[in-house]
């Protein structure tokens, strides 16, 4: 893999895991490294409103302007919440970050050590010409078994929609094109032009409604995430990530 090749980030709340995937020379993405999430606030499920202490779930774009090397939490980047899907449902919130440290109010806290490496990988990709990094944030690994274990959860229609995007990525090993119409995500739409997030989907796109109207959380109180499994370790043995991390230490 080239040092400045594009990257993609995947987050799984229930497994307390953030993954960095990197593009190989064939244009496909492969898992580069996994990091334990030190803390996220809230429960499984999307962020709905300012002050609900939920960490977001969904598909987001990170651009160079969202990078913050001067964060009070060491290093950070903004997740991009709310995106077009969130706004179409009236969801509110701001400054939802992936950052260092181990304190979270609606964010994903990764520890300073891990964040140094994650931030460096994203920064190097931008220096290599990547315009935006796709962030895929999930409640858990989107397997049929995991969905079945959460059957009856009111967020299930939303999670089934996220699974469609997750499957699109894992099948092609490339970031899916993400659009929004009819207040729902659509992936790899075979159309030209922009879609109206609040308008019905055009012909040729399945318009079966999936995401329902905005509803309050059953509980807005923060809860501690599940304990780490202990199967994920850092620092990584990957030489690209190690060198980027070392360069960051010299800068910051």
Listing of model-derived features with the role each one plays in the protein:
Residues 31-33:
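Residue-level detector of beta-propeller blades
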Residues 23-27:
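Short loop/turn segments immediately following beta-strands, especially the blade-tip
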Residues 177, 181-252:
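Proline-rich, low-complexity linker regions of envelope-associated factors in Gram-negative bacteria
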Residues 1-8, 19-22, 37-50, 57-63, ...:
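N-terminal post-signal-peptidase region of extra-cytosolic proteins
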Residues 6, 13-14:
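Active-site-adjacent structural elements in enzyme catalytic domains
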Residues 14, 36-42, 135-143:
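Acidic helix-start/capping segments at beta-turn-to-alpha-helix junctions
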Residues 1, 81-101, 224-226, 230-232, ...:
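Glycine/serine-rich loop-strand microenvironments at binding/catalytic pocket rims
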Residues 51-210:
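Exported/periplasmic cell-wall-interacting domains
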């Amino acid at each position: 893999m080239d040092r400045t090749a594009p990257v993609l980030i995947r987050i799984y709340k229930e497994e307390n895991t953030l993954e960095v995937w990197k593009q190989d020379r064939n244009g496909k993405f492969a898992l580069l490294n996994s990091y334990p999430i030190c803390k996220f606030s809230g429960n499984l499920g999307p962020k709905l409103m300012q002050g609900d202490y939920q960490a977001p779930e969904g598909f987001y774009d990170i651009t160079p302007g969202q990078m913050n090397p001067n964060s009070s939490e060491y290093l950070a980047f903004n997740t991009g919440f709310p995106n077009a899907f969130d706004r179409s449902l009236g969801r509110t919130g701001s400054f939802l970050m992936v950052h260092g440290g181990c304190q979270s109010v609606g964010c994903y806290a990764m520890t300073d050590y891990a964040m140094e490496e994650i931030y460096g990988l994203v920064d190097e990709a931008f220096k290599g010409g990547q315009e935006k990094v796709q962030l895929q944030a999930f409640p858990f690994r989107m397997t049929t078994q995991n969905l079945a274990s959460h059957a009856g959860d009111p967020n299930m229609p939303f999670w089934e929609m996220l699974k469609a995007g997750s499957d699109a990525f894992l099948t092609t090993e490339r970031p899916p094109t993400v659009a929004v119409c009819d207040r729902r995500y659509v992936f790899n739409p075979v159309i030209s032009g922009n879609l109206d997030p609040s308008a019905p989907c055009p012909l040729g796109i399945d318009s079966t409604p999936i995401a329902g109207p905005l509803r309050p959380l059953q509980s807005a109180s923060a809860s501690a995430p599940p304990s780490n499994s202990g199967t994920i370790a850092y620092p990584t043995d990957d030489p690209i990530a190690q060198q980027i991390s070392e360069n960051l230490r010299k800068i910051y």
